C-alpha cells in the first residue's frame, strides 16, 4: 500500500512539472498569454522610429526562445524568465 501511495505521489509531481507553461504579457493589450513550447523568455522592447516625436515609442511585448537582438532604433530591451515579468 505504501508503495502504491509513493508511486502516485511521484507520478503527480512529474505530471505537474511537465504541465507547467510560461506566461508573458503580449502587446497590443498587455494581457497575459501562454507561451508556445520552447519560448521560455518574456521580453519588453521599446523602440523609436521615424515618427517617434509625433506617435511616441513603439512597445512590443511577448514570448521568445532567445532574447531579441538590440537594434539601433531600440531605446530599451528587457528579457526575463518569470511569469508576466515583462511589464
UniProtKB/Swiss-Prot annotation:
**How would you summarize the oligomeric state and partners of this protein?**
Homodimer and heterodimer with kappa 3-bungarotoxin; non-covalently linked.
Q: Which family does it belong to?
A: Belongs to the three-finger toxin family. Long-chain subfamily. Kappa-neurotoxin sub-subfamily.
Subcellular localization is given as: Secreted
> Which key words are in the record?
Acetylcholine receptor inhibiting toxin, Disulfide bond, Ion channel impairing toxin, Neurotoxin, Postsynaptic neurotoxin, Secreted, Signal, Toxin
Q: Does the keyword Secreted apply?
A: yes
- Give the primary localization class: secreted
Q: What does this protein do?
A: Postsynaptic neurotoxin that binds and inhibits neuronal nicotinic acetylcholine receptors (nAChR) with high affinity (IC(50)<100 nM). Is a selective, and slowly reversible antagonist of alpha-3/CHRNA3-containing and some alpha-4/CHRNA4-containing AChRs.
Report the record's disulfide bonds.
Answer: 24-42, 35-63, 48-52, 67-79, 80-85
UniProt-listed InterPro entries: Snake_3FTx, Snake_toxin-like_sf, Snake_toxin_con_site, Toxin_cobra-type
- Signal peptide span per the entry? 1-21
Q: Which Pfam families match?
A: Toxin_cobra-type
User: In its keyword annotation, does this UniProt entry include Disulfide bond?
Assistant: yes
The molecule here is called Kappa-2-bungarotoxin
Checking SUPFAM superfamilies in the record gives: Snake toxin-like (SSF57302)
- Give the record's GO CC terms: extracellular region
What's one GO MF term for it? acetylcholine receptor inhibitor activity
Q: In which tissues is it expressed?
A: Expressed by the venom gland.
Amino acid at each position: 500500500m505504501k508503495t502504491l501511495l509513493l508511486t502516485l505521489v511521484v507520478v503527480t509531481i512529474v505530471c505537474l512539472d511537465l504541465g507547467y507553461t510560461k506566461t508573458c504579457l503580449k502587446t497590443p493589450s498587455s494581457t497575459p498569454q501562454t507561451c508556445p513550447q520552447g519560448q521560455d523568455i518574456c521580453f519588453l522592447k521599446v523602440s523609436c522610429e521615424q515618427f517617434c516625436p509625433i506617435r511616441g515609442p513603439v512597445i512590443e511585448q511577448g514570448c521568445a526562445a532567445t532574447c531579441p537582438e538590440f537594434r539601433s532604433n531600440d531605446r530599451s530591451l528587457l528579457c526575463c524568465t518569470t511569469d508576466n515579468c515583462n511589464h
